[in-house]
């Protein structure tokens, strides 16, 4: 579970981010929330984006309700 994270990005950031490790995406009022199981990759390569540690609830919600 510690490898999972929710990325919170603007539409502009979403277009530029590497989507290879994104499991699900979901439109939000701020832009796009993205679930990944490669948290460290995004922390190291995209320091400008918000990376929240994925709680079990967040991971389940994203897996059942996200797009992909």
Label every PLM stretch briefly.
Residues 30-68:
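C-terminal coupling/interaction segments
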Residues 1-36:
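ABC transporter nucleotide-binding domain
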């Amino acid at each position: 579970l510690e490898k999972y994270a929710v990325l919170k990005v603007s539409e502009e950031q979403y277009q530029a981010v590497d989507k290879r490790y994104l499991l699900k995406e979901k439109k939000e009022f701020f832009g796009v929330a993205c679930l990944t199981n490669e948290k460290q990759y995004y922390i190291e390569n995209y320091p400008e984006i918000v990376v929240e540690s994925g709680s079990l609830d967040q991971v389940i919600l994203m897996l059942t309700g996200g797009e992909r």
